[in-house]
Amino acid sequence: MNPEPGGDYDEESPVSADLVAGDGDIEASLRPKNLHDFIGQPRVREQLQLVLTGAKMRGGTPDHILLSGPPGLGKTSMAMIIAAELGSSLRLTSGPALERAGDLAAMLSNLVEGDVLFIDEIHRIARPAEEMLYLAMEDFRVDVVVGKGPGATSIPLEVAPFTLVGATTRSGALTGPLRDRFGFTAHMDFYEPAELQQILMRSAGILGVQLGEEAGAEIANRSRGTPRIANRLLRRVRDYAEVRADGVVTREIAHAALAVYDVDQLGLDRLDRSVLSALVRSFGGGPVGVSTLAVAVGEEPATVEEVCEPFLVRAGMIARTPRGRVATAAAWTQLGLTPPPDAVTGGIEVRVNEPQASLFDPQDP
């Protein structure tokens, strides 16, 4: 797993969307091999099909491709599919691994014509490597500086025509010059429960799990719209079914297994519920700053803000305001409490008791 904010929580939570130990080998076996097998993201699939087919008809390489979206939605799988559809080799690396321009130059020099270079977390690439990448993307060449000081010379090196596929969970963190060099950008959205159920049934077949349709729906509804989480929960439910039952995953077995792992019917885990409880019971529903809220639940502010909060906002449990986080009416109801009359009704960023004209004020604590 990449060293992102989140600490030990990411390692223990079954509903963390980040890649954790134990996911890698199994995820590889579950990945779809072509666009036809890829479930969900219909608009992205259609767009990519046109881009790739057009390039093959012209006999050239397609434009560089940027895939953006939250973790666990299939960006790496899509990069592998792009290479497979083109009949090309895939070279994989990540932004944090490219610390120096020389790291990138070494990788580019080993490419052959038509290769697909996949850079995960491309928003974290070091600036010297990024600047070298500009020229490689546009002109398929790089300038390697030899020596130091006044005697340094720049040697141009040709790079075989290739397609760069970049993946990012934070497209806003990309510099403008880098973003502009991608000819096609696709944003991957969260999945519908029905799509996740299809993914679960497919994964169950590959893993040899006897999964009933109702059980698949139960797991899908708790997977936060994320295939990685769905497949992880499937493995945990499989363990429960094999150890405490006859190995067949029914709806009742799935419900009992997910209760053991503290994943409720909305997909909330221990930390999510702790944040909601603190916000409502300790701070009267807010507003409260994220740092104060993190202290109340015994976690780092980055964990609350980057790991926990996005799903709670999307689920309509928390609203972000200029004065802090506010519990919505849905959060009060989720905790079995009666919401106050002035409770916020949505999880988007809202203004509380302020005029409409200030709705788009960029301030955010």
Curated annotation (Swiss-Prot):
Cellular localization per UniProt: Cytoplasm
Ranges for region Small ATPAse domain (RuvB-S): 192-262
Record-level GO BP terms: DNA recombination; DNA repair
GO CC aspect terms: cytoplasm; Holliday junction resolvase complex
Source organism, top-level taxon: Bacteria
Keyword Transmembrane helix on entry: no
Positions contributing to DNA binding: R320, R325
Binding of Mg(2+), residues: T76
EC number annotated for this UniProt entry: 3.6.4.-
Principal localisation: cytoplasm
Stretches for region Large ATPase domain (RuvB-L): 1-191
Reactions accelerated catalytically: ATP + H2O = ADP + phosphate + H(+)
Function as written in the Swiss-Prot or TrEMBL entry: The RuvA-RuvB-RuvC complex processes Holliday junction (HJ) DNA during genetic recombination and DNA repair, while the RuvA-RuvB complex plays an important role in the rescue of blocked DNA replication forks via replication fork reversal (RFR). RuvA specifically binds to HJ cruciform DNA, conferring on it an open structure. The RuvB hexamer acts as an ATP-dependent pump, pulling dsDNA into and through the RuvAB complex. RuvB forms 2 homohexamers on either side of HJ DNA bound by 1 or 2 RuvA tetramers; 4 subunits per hexamer contact DNA at a time.
Family as reported in the entry's similarity comment: Belongs to the RuvB family.
Domain text: Has 3 domains, the large (RuvB-L) and small ATPase (RuvB-S) domains and the C-terminal head (RuvB-H) domain. The head domain binds DNA, while the ATPase domains jointly bind ATP, ADP or are empty depending on the state of the subunit in the translocation cycle. During a single DNA translocation step the structure of each domain remains the same, but their relative positions change.
Protein name listed in UniProt: Holliday junction branch migration complex subunit RuvB
